[in-house]
Amino acid sequence: MNNLHRELAPISSAAWSQIEDEVARTFKRLVAGRRVVDVTGPGGADLAGVGTGHEIGIEAPLEGIRARQREVKPLVELRVPFALSRDAIDDVERGAEDSDWQPAKDAALRLAFAEDRAIFDGYGAAQITGIREGASNPLLLLPAETAGYPAVIAKALEELRLQGVDGPYTVLLGSDAYTAVSEANDQGYPVLEHIRRFVSGEIIWAPAIAGGCILSTRGGDFALHLGQDVSIGYLSHDDQSVHLYLQESFTFLMLTSEACVVVRPE
């Protein structure tokens, strides 16, 4: 037994398999940060912190002694509760392939958005500085007309090169910006294809954020440290519902502030 207490849930192995598949598929489709940062772990539920390699001066215990404390970033644990119908769960044993797992998918969306927003925009309460929050390059504005997006992205790439940041370079765009650029044409030529001509990496849909960013995926600039990866745990049940939760623990290190250019709508 572990602290997820899954063996106490009135859920068959077949139903667990369907629930896990829906959660994994939904989380993977929605999360963007893991596609562009270095991911270390999972190190396990007992991983409590990650050393930054830095020291902080503290008061010495005796005269003539220098005291330094190692800086450690504690992991944050996120939990999203949800409930599933007993009927939906039991129907799997009767051969159902269409049980309603929407509450599990909704929980996966919330967890994916929470992780991505911590990675890109920071999470002060968890001592996390996000990529866009910590970026040192000038902010660029996306014009109202999507035909102007390629010029802005080209300028962002130029800024990265001027800062000595090598590629490959990847573009992340929030839902509104990604949809707009996907549907747009410039004199009959798709704007998205125009951007792809000079971006060496991917153009990624990042629904958790507004605006977007252009960054290097060369490695060594951004680090996500996982303790417990996304897991499903059991809380309680009654004659109608089974109460479960999604849980993960992580911290994020912003290592190179010049490796990202933030873009926002005008």
Predicted regions and their residues:
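Extended, solvent-exposed, turn-rich assembly/linker loops in the middle of proteins
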Residues: R132-H194
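Long, hydrophobic/aromatic-enriched structural stretches that serve as scaffold segments
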Residues: T52-D98
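Alpha-helical scaffold segments that mediate packing/assembly in large oligomeric complexes
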Residues: D90-K155
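Sequence/fold signature of self-assembling virion shell proteins
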Residues: T40, A184-E266
